[in-house]
Structures are given as C-alpha cells and as structure tokens.
C-alpha cells in the first residue's frame, strides 16, 4: 500500500517518548476510530465463522455429505477454502483499492465497505443452498471477508502520524481481537444454544453489515484525516 507521507526525516527517527495524551489523541481521529470499529466487527465475524462453520456443517448439514459425514474432511476443505480465498482476496483487495485511490481519496474505506457487504448474502445463502454448491458460497463469503485486509490497514497507517503509528497499530490489534474473535466463538455458541445455529449465522452475517456501515461512514473523513496526518508530520519541531 502507498504511504502518502513519504520517507521519515532524520529528526523523526529520534522522537520524544510517547505520552498518554498522544494515545488518547488517536480517538479524536474519526477515521481511525471507525476503521477500528469496522475491523472489530469483521474480526468478530471471521472468528465466529472459522470456529463454528465446520461443526455446523457436520451437525446440521451432515446429510448433504452422505451417510457418513467426516468432520476431518470438512475441516480440510474449509481450511483450504480459507487459505485460498483469503490469500487471493488480500492481494486483489490491495490492488483494487490502490487503483481506485488514485482518483478517490476515500477508496480504502469504500472498497472495504462494499466488499464486506457482498459477504452478507453469500453467508445467508449458504444456510439454504445444498452441497456441493454451498462450498462456492462459502468461498465467496470468505473471499469478501478478507478483501479489506490491505486497504483497511493502509488507511490505518495513513491517518496516524509516524510518531504514534506503532502505538496506533498496537491499540488497533488489541481492540479488534479483544472485542472480535476472542469473544465471538462463545457468544455465537450461546446464541446457537438459546435459539439455533441458523440464527447464530444470521447474527454473524449481520455483523458484517455493521462493519460495512462503519467503513462507508468513515469514508467521508478519510481524505481529510490523511491530510491532517501529513500536515502534522511537516509541522513537527526540529524537522529537517
């Protein structure tokens, strides 16, 4: 992903220690906050689907696999789909977002928001389409869940000043995992126990809509916040 700020100067390599106020200042960057919220929702969905989908297919859709469904084989196929779809989507998502970003400053968020929106119908349809055709929908759903990986992380870097960028990434990683894939498996399990697994997958699909809303909402701030990060870099005292 292209970094709009260019190389760091000699002065920037000797930054003063990060202060608590610098960390709290990150929460005043609207595109950073909305990006983190969207990535949390995305991670929640990925964590829940990764944990529960093989078991769902074995317990609820076993008849689609013949008289003797094999959980190991289901895990193997799903794992292969996740690796292939995730890798292709990550590379293609970055390439598409970079091309669109040349004309549209908000492209990183718009590409992320539209892509994850497309995962919603694939996840819902997977619940009703018989196998082996449902594997195609699973591939499509996983593909669009990972399509945002490049652009969302590039946007994260672009809106944070270099002096706090590592801290911004660390805080983002903590939040998206603590409130994303760390809690989604037990929460989805609770929903499945109270209602059923179909309802649990509808909830996971709905969370992808929430991620889409956050990214599309944040698109209006992304260009402005990127420019502010550039200006904050240029105005740092003692810079060459």
Regions found by a protein language model. Give the residues of each.
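A late C-terminal transmembrane helix in Major Facilitator Superfamily
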Residues: 159-195
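Juxtamembrane intracellular "pre-TM" segments in multi-pass secondary transporters
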Residues: 6-36, 63, 236-240
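Interfacial helix-cap and linker-helix signal at transmembrane-aqueous boundaries
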Residues: 57-58, 96-97, 101, 187-196
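C-terminal transmembrane helical hairpin of 12-TM major facilitator-type secondary transporters
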Residues: 103-152
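Multi-pass alpha-helical transporter architecture, strongest
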Residues: 122-129, 202-239
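Extracytoplasmic gate region of multi-pass secondary transporters
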Residues: 29-91, 145-149, 153, 180-185
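C-terminal membrane-cytosol helix-exit motif in multi-pass small-molecule transporters
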Residues: 1-10, 214-220
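A membrane-interface helix-boundary motif in multi-pass transporters
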Residues: 67-71, 107-110, 190-208
């Amino acid at each position: 992903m292209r970094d709009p700020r260019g190389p760091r100067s000699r002065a920037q390599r000797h930054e003063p220690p990060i202060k608590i106020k610098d960390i709290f200042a990150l929460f005043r960057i609207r595109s950073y906050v909305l990006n983190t919220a969207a990535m949390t929702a995305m991670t929640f969905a990925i964590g829940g689907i990764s944990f529960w989908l093989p078991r769902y297919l074995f317990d609820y859709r076993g008849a689609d696999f013949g008289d003797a469904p094999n959980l190991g084989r289901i895990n193997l196929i799903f794992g292969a789909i996740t690796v292939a779809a995730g890798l292709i989507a990550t590379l293609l998502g970055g390439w598409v977002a970079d091309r669109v970003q040349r004309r549209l400053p908000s492209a990183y968020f718009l590409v992320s928001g539209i892509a994850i929106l497309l995962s919603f119908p694939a996840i819902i349809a997977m619940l009703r389409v018989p196998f082996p055709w449902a594997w195609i929908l699973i591939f499509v759903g996983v593909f669009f869940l990972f399509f945002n990986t490049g652009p969302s992380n590039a946007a994260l870097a672009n809106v944070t000043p270099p002096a706090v960028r590592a801290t911004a990434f660390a805080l983002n990683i903590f939040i998206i995992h603590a409130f994303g894939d760390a809690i989604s498996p037990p929460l989805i399990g609770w929903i499945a126990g109270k209602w059923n697994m179909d309802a649990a997958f509808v909830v996971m699909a709905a969370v992808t809509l929430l991620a889409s809303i956050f990214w599309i909402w944040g698109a209006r701030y992304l260009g402005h916040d990127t420019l502010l990060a550039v200006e904050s870099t240029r105005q740092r005292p003692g810079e060459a």
